[in-house]
Amino acid sequence: MLACLLITFTCEACKMGESKNLHDEIKILEKINRHFSDEFTKFFSNFLKNSVELVSCSIKIGSCTSNKEIITNLRCLNLIEILPYKKKSFIIFPYNFLSNIIDILFGGQGDFKDHTKKIRDITSTESLVNKKIMKFITNAFSEIYKKYFVKEINFFNTKTFFDFKKYNFDLNKLFLINCFNFKINNTEIFFNFLIPKSILKYQNEKKFFSTYDSHKNTCIEKNIENKVSLNDIYNVEVNIISKIIGISVSYDKIYNLSIGDVLSIKKPNKITGFIQDQAIFLGNYKRFNEQSIIFIEEFIDSSSESNQDKEYSNE
């Protein structure tokens, strides 16, 4: 399967060229779109029971004001929430996209021309097909972005608009405009995925670890193995174990503990954070909206022996 990947940047985003991280950002965006295109091709082939070929996928930074074809041929606008950043993105299907897919599903060649543009002409079948495709796209992008981007990111389809005027869309806002073009039989279909340009700032704050890269961060692994130094840990995700401070159990009671026993804790809100067996910070533990929250009060210098028992100094 031959696929063409095109990366372009419009004049509206010329400032991006000044960024020293632009090359890295492009590489990450290339990998994300290439990975998604492969996954979507497999999904679409299975869904339509037809051969699906990727024609091209492109990225450009711009607004809908300078890319009016995106909204003038709109059939449905899917509003996507990017969590936890609370950013809004959009997946836009043009006219004939859903109708051609339905035509293929019912044995046609995908060359059906839908000339209706009224909201009442949106069928329940189109809504169901849109929902199924959107579920795959959001799930796929969530998983792919977690591999190349940040672990906590998720895409959620919150609402679908079949009338562009019903959503207060900012035509001048800059987006990463991702266009995916596929061929089914002899019919080409495409859709656009608009991701806010501001999402790039989160890329700059993270260190990318691709699952396709063979290298390992041996420096961090070595530092954790020998000693934990907060100066050596940055832009990485680590597993931290929290231990409660102030719990005491008598020697005799340890051997008589049973399910249901209640143990007294002097300071139930005090905890010490550990990486492996090394204490790294002191903090307060709270429960808020069914979530466990830790407020870090002080970092512990692992090179100083005087801090080894510091977590007990406030008893």
From Swiss-Prot:
Membrane topology of this protein: Peripheral membrane protein
GO molecular function: cytoskeletal motor activity
Disulfide bond annotation, renumbered to this chain: none
InterPro entries: CheC-like_sf, Flag_FliM, FliN-like_C, SpoA-like_sf
GO biological process, one term: positive chemotaxis
Subcellular locations according to the entry: Cell inner membrane; Bacterial flagellum basal body
Pfam families per record: FliM (PF02154), FliMN_C (PF01052)
Alphabetical UniProt keywords: Bacterial flagellum, Cell inner membrane, Cell membrane, Chemotaxis, Flagellar rotation, Membrane
Entry's Gene Ontology cellular component terms: bacterial-type flagellum basal body; plasma membrane
Similarity comment: Belongs to the FliM family.
Task performed by this protein: FliM is one of three proteins (FliG, FliN, FliM) that forms the rotor-mounted switch complex (C ring), located at the base of the basal body. This complex interacts with the CheY and CheZ chemotaxis proteins, in addition to contacting components of the motor that determine the direction of flagellar rotation.
Designated name of the protein: Flagellar motor switch protein FliM
Organism: Buchnera aphidicola subsp. Acyrthosiphon pisum (strain APS)
